[in-house]
Design a protein with these regions (language model features):
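Beta-rich carbohydrate-recognition and catalytic domains
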Residues: 18-50, 55-113, 123-253, 257-303, ...
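Short, charged beta->alpha transition segments
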Residues: 118-120
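Bacterial N-terminal signal peptides
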Residues: 4-13
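Active-site pocket scaffolds in enzymes
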Residues: 359-360
C-alpha cells in the first residue's frame, strides 16, 4: 500500500512536470491567428463599450456588455446602458441586439434609479433561461449602488418584463447587494480603507468548483476583494473571505481558481507602486495571505486579469505594460495568456498584440472549444466588444 502511494505520487509529479506546449511554439503567431478570426459585437451606434461576459448554448453565444452612444471609454455616467447580443457560432454573425437595462428604466415591477448600468454578467439558470446581472450606480457616490438581475427566455429570445435586486450575505446577515454591507463585513476583519457608495461588481464570474458556483467580487474605487459563492436560487451572493492586503497596493479586479493541492489562488490588479499583479493564496478561502508578486508575471499593468481551468490546464491571462504604438504609452496593447498543469510552472501559449488594444477578455468553454469576448478601441481606448474562438 505504501509503495503504491509513492508510485502514484511520483506519477502525478511527472505528469505535472511535462510541458503543455510543443517545442518551438510561437505564442505571438498563435495570438495573431486568433485575433484574425474575431468579429465585432457592439452595434453601429455604440461609441464606448467595455468588459463583456458571455454564456453559450447550442450554436449560439449570448454576450452581455455595457455601452454608451456618446464617447469612447466607459465614463459616460448615466448614459451607460447594458445589452445582450446573440451570435451565431456557425456563421460568426450577430443575429440580434436586445436591450437589458438603462438608467431610470421602468420595468413591470420597479423603476431603476438614475445611474450608470455597469459591468453585466450572465449565467445559465436552467434549460430555457439565462440570468443577467447588472450594477446600477450613481457614480457621484450620493446613493448606494445596487446589483440587479433579469431573466432571459431562450425560447422566446426575450427578457422578462421584471427586474430584481440581488442580495448579499455576510456574517451579519442578508442584505440588498449594496457596497456598504460589503465594506462593513471587511471592516470587521480589519480593513481600514474608507467606504465607497458605488463600485461593487460581480467581477470574476462564474466558476463551478466542487459543486459550488464561485466568483470574485470587487469594489473598484474601494480596493476591496472577496471570494464568494452564488446560491442555488442564483439571487444571493455570499462572502467566503476577503483579501485586501497590503492595503497600500490597492488590490482590485481579481481572478481566482483552486490549485491541484486544494489551495486557492487569486491574481489581483494593483493600482499602486509598480502596478504589477499581486497574488494571494488561501487554504480555506476564508483567510488569505498578503498579496505578493510572482516571478512568472513581470511588468504587469493595471488591468483585469483572468484565471481559468480548461480540461485540466490552467490559463492565466494578464496585461503587459509594454509599448508597441508610437506616440502612446504602454497602454493595454499586449495581453499574455500562459498555461500550466500545476499553477506554478507556466508557458506562454498566446501573446495578443494589437494597436487597437486587447483588454478585459473573458473566456468560456463550450462543446470542446474555448470562446471569448474582449474589449478593443482605437488608440487603446474602449469603443467596441469583439468575439472570437480561442481554440
Amino acid at each position: 500500500m505504501f509503495l503504491s502511494t509513492i508510485l502514484m505520487t511520483l506519477a502525478a509529479a511527472i505528469a505535472f512536470a511535462e510541458p503543455v506546449l510543443k517545442d518551438g511554439w510561437d505564442a505571438k503567431q498563435a495570438g495573431d491567428k486568433v485575433m484574425a478570426g474575431m468579429i465585432k459585437v457592439s452595434a453601429a451606434q455604440v461609441k464606448g463599450a467595455h468588459d463583456a461576459d458571455l454564456a453559450l448554448v447550442g450554436d449560439r453565444a449570448y454576450v452581455v456588455e455595457h455601452d454608451n452612444d456618446i464617447k469612447p471609454g466607459h465614463g459616460a455616467g448615466n448614459a451607460q446602458y447594458c445589452v445582450l447580443t446573440v451570435i451565431n457560432l456557425k456563421s460568426m454573425q450577430v443575429e440580434r441586439v436586445i436591450p437589458m437595462a438603462k438608467s431610470a428604466e421602468a420595468f413591470a415591477n420597479v423603476k431603476l434609479p438614475s445611474g450608470a448600468c455597469f459591468v453585466p454578467r450572465v449565467i445559465r439558470l436552467d434549460e430555457h433561461t439565462h440570468r443577467s446581472y447588472v450594477a446600477c450606480a450613481d457614480q457621484s457616490g450620493r446613493r448606494q449602488s445596487q446589483t440587479w438581475y433579469r431573466d432571459f427566455d431562450l425560447r422566446l429570445q426575450a427578457f422578462s418584463p421584471d427586474i430584481h435586486r440581488v442580495k448579499l450575505r455576510t456574517a451579519d446577515g442578508t442584505f440588498d447587494m449594496e457596497p456598504r454591507y460589503f465594506h462593513a463585513d471587511a471592516a470587521k476583519q480589519g480593513f481600514q480603507e474608507p467606504a465607497k457608495a458605488f463600485g461593487l461588481y460581480l467581477l470574476d464570474s462564474f466558476k463551478q468548483i466542487d459543486g459550488r458556483t464561485l466568483l470574485a467580487i470587487n469594489n473598484f474605487p474601494g480596493a476591496q476583494n472577496a471570494l464568494a459563492t452564488l446560491n442555488e436560487a442564483r439571487d444571493t451572493i455570499e462572502v467566503i473571505g476577503h483579501y485586501n492586503e497590503p492595503s497600500e497596493a490597492r488590490l482590485t479586479e481579481s481572478s481566482v481558481n483552486r490549485l491541484p493541492d486544494g489551495t486557492w489562488m487569486a491574481i489581483c490588479r494593483s493600482e499602486s507602486g509598480n502596478r504589477n499583479y499581486r497574488f494571494v493564496t488561501s487554504a480555506d478561502g476564508k483567510t488569505w495571505t498578503r498579496g505578493e508578486e510572482r516571478p512568472f508575471v513581470s511588468k504587469g499593468s493595471n488591468s483585469k486579469p483572468t484565471f481559468d481551468k480548461f480540461d485540466g490546464i490552467y490559463y492565466l491571462g494578464w496585461q503587459e505594460a509594454s509599448k508597441i504604438v508610437e506616440g502612446h504609452g504602454a497602454g493595454r496593447y499586449i495581453f499574455n495568456l500562459d498555461v500550466s498543469r500545476d499553477g506554478t510552472t507556466w508557458e506562454r501559449k498566446y501573446r495578443f498584440e494589437s494597436n487597437d488594444s486587447f483588454q478585459y477578455p473573458t473566456f468560456r468553454q463550450h462543446d470542446g472549444s474555448v470562446w471569448f469576448t474582449v474589449t478593443q478601441g482605437k488608440g487603446g481606448s474602449t469603443d467596441r466588444i469583439m468575439f472570437g474562438k480561442l481554440e
